[in-house]
Design a protein with these regions (language model features):
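Active-site loop-to-helix junction immediately N-terminal to the catalytic Tyr of the SDR YXXXK motif
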Residues: 74-82, 94, 122
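Active-site helix of classical SDR
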Residues: 48, 84
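Alpha-helical segment proximal to the catalytic Tyr-Lys
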Residues: 53, 97-100, 166
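Residue(s) in the substrate-gating loop at a strand-loop-helix junction
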Residues: 68
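C-terminal substrate-recognition "lid" of short-chain dehydrogenase/reductases
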Residues: 145-175
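Active-site loop immediately N-terminal to the catalytic Tyr-X3-Lys motif
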Residues: 73-79, 101-102, 144
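Catalytic Tyr-X3-Lys loop
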Residues: 7-45, 64, 88, 143
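Short, flexible catalytic-loop segment of classical short-chain dehydrogenase/reductase
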Residues: 72, 110-122
Length: 179
C-alpha cells in the first residue's frame, strides 16, 4: 500500500477537510493510488502477458493470481488497495474466458486476514497484546482466528492441480475463515 493512497480515519466528517493532520479521501494522490494499482493490477497483468504466451496449447497450464477479500468487502482506510484487488479479481475472470479455448485455466486466491511480518505492527501492540483492529477482525470472523500459511498453500495446490481442479477456471477462492 502507499501512505498517499490511505486515509487516516474510517469515517469521514466535514471537519476533516480543514484538519491538516487528517488524510481523507480528498487527499489521496494520483501517485499514491497509481503506485498501488501498478503494484497489484499491472503486477498481475504484465507477467501474465509475458508468461501466458508460452502456455498456449500446452497441457496442464494455469495461472493463479492473488486477489484479496478486500475485493469483496473493502476495508476502511485503503480504498486504492481494495480497488486494485477488485481489478485483479475481474481480470482473473476475464482471462479465464479469454484463454478457455487454448487450454489455460485462470483462477485466484483471495486471502482474508493472515498474521505476517508485514502487518504485525497493525495487529499487535508493542507488548504483544492484540490491537483494537485485531479484536475487530477476530470478532467479525466466524472462525475467530487469523488464517495459517498452510491454509493458503493448500488452496493454492488445489487450484493449480490438474487432477483436482481441471474443470475449474475463473474462480476467485476466498480463504478467509468466513469473514
Amino acid at each position: 500500500n502507499s501512505p498517499k493512497a490511505t486515509t487516516t480515519k474510517e469515517y469521514f466528517s466535514k471537519e476533516d477537510i480543514d484538519d491538516e493532520n487528517i488524510i481523507s479521501f480528498f487527499d489521496l494522490t494520483k501517485e499514491g493510488v497509481g503506485f498501488v494499482f501498478d503494484l497489484n493490477f499491472l503486477g498481475t497483468l504484465l507477467p501474465t502477458q509475458e508468461f501466458a504466451k508460452d502456455m498456449i496449447g500446452k497441457k496442464g497450464c494455469n495461472i493463479l493470481n492473488i486477489s484479496s477479500m478486500n475485493a469483496y468487502t473493502p476495508l476502511t482506510k485503503i480504498p486504492a488497495y481494495s480497488g486494485a484487488k477488485s481489478a485483479v479479481s475481474n481480470l482473473t475472470q476475464w482471462l479465464a474466458v479469454h484463454f478457455s479455448k487454448v487450454g489455460i485455466r485462470v483462477n485466484a486466491i483471495a486471502p482474508g486476514f493472515f498474521s505476517t511480518n508485514q502487518n504485525k505492527a497493525l495487529l499487535c501492540n508493542k507488548d504483544g497484546t492484540p490491537t483494537a483492529r485485531t479484536n475487530k477482525i477476530i470478532n467479525a470472523t466466524p472462525m475467530e482466528r487469523f488464517g495459517e500459511i498452510d491454509e493458503l498453500i493448500g488452496a493454492t495446490l488445489f487450484l493449480i492441480s490438474d487432477n483436482a481442479a481441471s474443470f475449474i477456471t475463473g474462480v476467485v477462492l476466498p480463504i478467509d475463515g468466513g469473514f
